[in-house]
Swiss-Prot record:
Keyword Hydrolase: yes
Listed name of the protein: Peptide deformylase
Provenance organism: Thermotoga sp. (strain RQ2)
Cofactor binding note from Swiss-Prot or TrEMBL: Binds 1 Fe(2+) ion.
Keyword Transferase: no
Length: 164
């Protein structure tokens, strides 16, 4: 199992590098990430959240775990909805985030094969949230400065726990 990196850890702000090797090490890392995600009752976990600056994440929105490697968002539906999101890197913080209701995506599986699919609702939301992590974008970047200010003390408390 991995240790979850929390707000204040520099790896969360980096743009992750593409995956180039689809080998047993990648598969083992993904298995460990899935185990970690389930242990913390998450529905998604991006590689940067466990200290790995590479472009992949795992998610499970009720249909079993999926590994998403080198993802792209091909189309974003202009229709959006606001819903509450949490994040394993922000313990006990939940914020309202506006995201597209439907997206068309492309990614690679653990064999390096390309997968294209359309996601909607909760699956689209989780994909967009994890995709943000790969670009160094966090949930607090998607809320207003006023809301961020209200969370300032909690954020400072979380950042203080980071081992440097």
């Amino acid at each position: 199992m991995y240790r979850i990196r929390v707000f204040g850890d520099p790896v969360l702000r980096k743009r992750a590098k593409p995956v180039t090797k689809f080998d047993d090490n990648l598969k083992k890392t993904i298995e460990r990430m899935i185990e970690t995600m389930y242990h913390y009752d998450g529905v998604g976990l991006a590689a940067p959240q466990v200290g790995i600056s590479q472009r992949f994440f795992v998610m499970d929105v009720g249909n079993g775990p999926v590994a998403v490697i080198n993802p792209e968002i091909l189309e974003i539906d202009p229709e959006t909805e606001v819903a509450e999101e949490g994040c394993l890197s922000f313990p006990e913080i939940f914020v309202e985030i506006e995201r597209s209701k439907r997206i068309k995506v492309k990614y690679q599986n653990t064999r390096g094969e390309y997968v294209e699919e359309e996601l909607e609702g909760y699956a689209a939301r989780v994909f967009q949230h994890e995709f943000d992590h790969l670009n160094g974008v966090l949930i607090i970047d998607r809320i207003s400065p006023a809301k961020r200010l209200l969370l300032r003390k909690k954020l400072m408390d979380i950042a203080r726990t980071v081992k440097r």
